[in-house]
Amino acid sequence: MNIYAVGGAIRDELLGVPVQDRDYVVVGATPEQMVAQGYRPVGKDFPVFLHPQTHEEYALARTERKTAAGYHGFQFFYAPDVTLEEDLARRDLTINAMAREVRPDGELTGPVIDPFNGQGDVQARVFRHVSDAFLEDPVRILRIARFAARFVDFTVAPETLALMRKMVADGEVDALVAERVWQEVSRGLMEKKPSRMFEVLRECGALARILPEIDALFGVLQRADYHPEVDTGVHVMMVVDHAAQQGYALQVRFAALAHDLGKATTPEDMLPRHIGHEGRSVDLLKPLCERLRVPNDCRDLAVLVAREHGNIHRVMEMGAAALVRLLERSDAIRKPARFAEALQACEADARGRLGFERREYPQAERLRVALVAARGVDAGAVAKRLADAPAGIKDALHQERVRAVELAIS
């Protein structure tokens, strides 16, 4: 029995970036031998075991072949005579198809085992497929795009890009299940430069298949005085990248991505203005979230930002009454943390424009001050005072908040 560390750990070691976790492959063993040594079986489709001390995953070396469409359509074969090279050959990219032997004490030993020149592609900063078996799994398109958002100086090899385009043309991408699309897109949004993910998906044609609402934004004109970058798709990518640079949470980054969807459906005779795009954005966003089964926290924040970002940008012109209406409409008094995230997304929107990257955004502070004042009003006291006339509680509470905000912003 020989144990090897494989894949991302070897790649990251060569790149000089922190190794988050390791994947292990065991060559020359049977499931019974693994159990006899104290490993606990956990794999459903193929034998994966948890180490008795570290609880890290160890998989028996295996091969696979395509049996049906989509990323579920695989049959796996494992046996003690499956070699390390055969196991590495089934992997997606050369940079993920390297290994090093593991000593009994857990330390790596010996040279990098690299049958597909992954080290050369790490040095050249290239994503290159291992073999034409790459064509068999459409998830690999999403993975390459996600890797592009993490390793921003890498490019896709022309021959690999050609295979990705073929997979799109053959309809393989259409077989992807919603949960897997969201899993990869959400992980890509959390990488260093999410725009690279969408750039790669556009290059191979996959973006139009899995996120047509985003793909449709590219080439849509905006007013150059507000948006020197002009192209709506370019603007949205700048917004998402700004949110990533600030380290914002996933729901903020998704809201940044989806805030301007309605600009793609602006009537041509209205361009480059986009009057009413906020409502159209919400109309497109809700079915998108349903289709991809986007988590509720991401969906709810994205809908709020899509609907209100134009109003939030204009709060410097608003008086106390309008500010309170905005806060109440946004449920900010009950959910201040969510509203704080909405302000992050709106600030990213304002700064995600050519030449505006470092521009101040006083709107956020004005709304923070207003929210503190509005939340300071004792709703219970108002309700108690109007116990005999409960129909008037809502309006009275609103007026109290307006007075409190008026004092706070004056």
Swiss-Prot record:
Statement: the UniProt record of this protein carries the keyword Nucleotide-binding: yes
Cofactor note (record): Magnesium is required for nucleotidyltransferase activity. Nickel for phosphatase activity.
Residue ranges of every copy of the HD domain listed in the record: 232-333
Annotated family: Belongs to the tRNA nucleotidyltransferase/poly(A) polymerase family. Bacterial CCA-adding enzyme type 1 subfamily.
GO biological process terms on file: RNA repair; tRNA 3'-terminal CCA addition
Transmembrane segments annotated in the record for this chain: none
A Pfam family annotated for this UniProt entry: PolyA_pol_RNAbd
Comment on protein domains: Comprises two domains: an N-terminal domain containing the nucleotidyltransferase activity and a C-terminal HD domain associated with both phosphodiesterase and phosphatase activities.
Chain's role: Catalyzes the addition and repair of the essential 3'-terminal CCA sequence in tRNAs without using a nucleic acid template. Adds these three nucleotides in the order of C, C, and A to the tRNA nucleotide-73, using CTP and ATP as substrates and producing inorganic pyrophosphate. tRNA 3'-terminal CCA addition is required both for tRNA processing and repair. Also involved in tRNA surveillance by mediating tandem CCA addition to generate a CCACCA at the 3' terminus of unstable tRNAs. While stable tRNAs receive only 3'-terminal CCA, unstable tRNAs are marked with CCACCA and rapidly degraded.
PROSITE patterns, sorted: HD
Coiled-coil annotated spans: none
Alphabetical UniProt keywords: ATP-binding, Hydrolase, Magnesium, Metal-binding, Multifunctional enzyme, Nickel, Nucleotide-binding, Nucleotidyltransferase, RNA repair, RNA-binding, Transferase, tRNA processing
E.C. designation(s): 2.7.7.72, 3.1.3.-, 3.1.4.-
Keyword tRNA processing: yes
Sites where the protein binds Mg(2+): D21, D23
Note: A single active site specifically recognizes both ATP and CTP and is responsible for their addition.
Native source organism of the sequence: Paraburkholderia phytofirmans (strain DSM 17436 / LMG 22146 / PsJN)
Ligand binding (ATP): G8, R11, R91, R143, R146
Catalysed transformations (reactions): a tRNA precursor + 2 CTP + ATP = a tRNA with a 3' CCA end + 3 diphosphate; a tRNA with a 3' CCA end + 2 CTP + ATP = a tRNA with a 3' CCACCA end + 3 diphosphate
Cofactor requirements of the protein: Mg(2+); Ni(2+)
Record-given protein name: Multifunctional CCA protein
Gene3D superfamilies on file: Beta Polymerase, domain 2 (3.30.460.10), cca-adding enzyme, domain 2 (1.10.3090.10)
MF GO annotations: ATP binding; CCA tRNA nucleotidyltransferase activity; cyclic-nucleotide phosphodiesterase activity; magnesium ion binding; phosphatase activity; tRNA binding
InterPro entries in the cross-refs: CCA_bact, HD_domain, NT_sf, PolA_pol_head_dom, PolyA_RNA-bd, tRNA_CCA-adding_enzyme
